[in-house]
């Protein structure tokens, strides 16, 4: 094995957010954080980052069929020096009815909170950038929102997305970054296999 190629692959995985690590040893964890591989949210208002996090709520292997489509529009300047970005998120279940018929609960999951067998239940958390905020402007009936939470001073919009075959979950929201932001808003979204299926 070529060590240079391995290091390049590891760096690519870290930079793309596909390779994250954790260590119980504080010194080792400090190295992981220094590499940018800890997965920790950004707390720097000058380099704003929106976090779009999904957790499998189906208790299943269903996420193989999850497609994530995220879009972000042009920023609008605000009087206080902050900027607001319009964003939208669409979650689609790419499983076919034939695949559903041939599957079982190991694939589709058994959480009683699911609306139907084809419901890919996703726990949705939108993390606002440091010093910024998120305002939900619209969502369809496939998204159930809960009360916002706070994590390390960041606003977290919480909810559940019911992603059924032919019935995607859709949510639109505005993300306002701090007036201290000197960079454009970046977005962290978990990887899926939608490009490899």
What positions do the PLM features span?
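Lumenal/extracellular ectodomains and adaptor appendage modules
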Residues: 1-197
């Amino acid at each position: 094995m070529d060590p240079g190629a391995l290091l390049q692959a590891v760096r690519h995985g870290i930079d793309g957010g596909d390779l994250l690590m954790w260590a119980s040893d504080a010194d080792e964890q400090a190295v992981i954080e220094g590499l940018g591989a800890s997965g920790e949210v950004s707390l720097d208002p000058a380099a704003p980052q929106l976090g779009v996090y999904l957790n499998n709520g189906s208790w299943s292997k269903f996420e193989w069929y999850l497609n994530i489509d995220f879009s972000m529009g042009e920023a609008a300047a605000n009087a206080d020096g902050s900027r607001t970005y319009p964003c939208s998120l669409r979650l689609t279940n790419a499983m076919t009815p034939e695949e559903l018929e041939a599957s079982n609960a190991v694939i589709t999951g058994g959480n009683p909170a699911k609306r139907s067998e084809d419901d890919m239940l996703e726990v949705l958390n939108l993390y606002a950038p440091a010093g910024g905020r998120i305002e939900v402007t619209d969502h369809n009936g496939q998204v159930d929102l809960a009360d916002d939470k706070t994590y390390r001073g960041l606003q977290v919009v919480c909810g559940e997305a019911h992603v059924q075959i032919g019935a995607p979950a859709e949510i639109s929201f505005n993300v306002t970054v701090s007036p201290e932001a000197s960079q454009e808003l970046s977005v962290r979204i978990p990887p899926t296999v939608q490009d490899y299926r």
